[in-house]
Amino acid sequence: MLALTRRRGEEIVIIDKETGEEMVIAVLRQMQHETRIGIEASPRFEIFRREVLERKRATDPA
């Protein structure tokens, strides 16, 4: 189960409550007085996201 999103320096991180695993989902970039957010689209994040969704479906009596 995803717990919370928090900011760690210039990174935005999600944390899996069950495993404590942290995953960077965005990186803040300062560009000419503007802050840009770049989303991480790494295969590792996609695998993590799928695993979390599968666990949620398995435990959610919907």
Task: For the regions a language model picked out, list residue spans one by one.
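Compact, glycine-rich, soluble single-domain proteins
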Residues: 1-62
